Amino acid sequence: MGGTELDEMYFQSLSIAEVKLIRPRKFGDCRGYFSEVFREKWFRKNVADVGLVQDNESLSAQIGTVRGLHFQLEPFAQGKLVRCTRGALFDVAVDVRVGSPTYGKWVSAELSQENGAQLWVPAGFAHGFMTLKADTVISYKVTAPYSAEHDRGLKWDDPAIGINWPKMTTYVLSEKDSSQPSLCELPVSFQYVKV
């Protein structure tokens, strides 16, 4: 885990090293708490040296709502810094970089209003989430603006990927997310470049 006791934020690489879990510190007293949730210089030094150009937010009213798995093609490929500002969600990143040693593998983290954790999902990964509470709000910063022409997706429950989604009695998906291609049907979108 990166960071020192003097830092306001800690981070750790998940089992796919490019995906990072960030935990901002909370400073509390009788009034509540204060937390610095983003500092560009710290982020560029410790997580990814990229610019974040747009903030997005979505509300999912029902528990078991699935959004994803989404990504965008170059030149509008998006890295995403994701946080949950109300409720809780199961957040997932899937490596779609052809040639990567972790191609088709996934990592996840639970993000919630309570834990304040954030997930960095770099370009070259499909991103999605499932709400664990009703009226969950997700907020995320992205490295490129939305482009409908470059918008792509991946089947959320593809058995070849095998995401261990939380069990729900029902899942709420859009028609678009219900009809995304599986990994084996996905055209080459990103090539892995070893650094």
Curated annotation (Swiss-Prot):
Task: Return any one Pfam family short name.
Answer: dTDP_sugar_isom
Biochemical pathway: Carbohydrate biosynthesis; dTDP-L-rhamnose biosynthesis
Q: Which GO terms describe its biological process?
A: dTDP-rhamnose biosynthetic process; polysaccharide biosynthetic process
Query: Active-site positions, per UniProt?
Result: H70, Y140
Under catalytic activity, the entry for this protein gives: dTDP-4-dehydro-6-deoxy-alpha-D-glucose = dTDP-4-dehydro-beta-L-rhamnose
Query: Which CDD domains does the entry mention?
Result: cupin_RmlC
**What residues bind substrate, as annotated?**
R31, E36, Q54, D55, N56, R67, K80, H127, D151, K176
EC annotation? 5.1.3.13
Give site residues, Participates in a stacking interaction with the thymidine ring of dTDP-4-oxo-6-deoxyglucose.
Y146
The record's Gene3D superfamilies line, in alphabetical order, gives: Jelly Rolls
Annotated keywords? Carbohydrate metabolism, Isomerase, Plasmid
SUPFAM superfamilies, A to Z: RmlC-like cupins
Annotated GO molecular function terms are: dTDP-4-dehydrorhamnose 3,5-epimerase activity
Gene Ontology, cellular component aspect: cytosol
Q: Does the keyword Iron apply?
A: no
Q: Which domain of life is it from?
A: Bacteria
* Role of this protein: Catalyzes the epimerization of the C3' and C5'positions of dTDP-6-deoxy-D-xylo-4-hexulose, forming dTDP-6-deoxy-L-lyxo-4-hexulose.
**NCBIfam families of this UniProt entry?**
rmlC
Name the family the entry cites: Belongs to the dTDP-4-dehydrorhamnose 3,5-epimerase family.
Subunit comment = Homodimer.
- The protein in question is named dTDP-4-dehydrorhamnose 3,5-epimerase
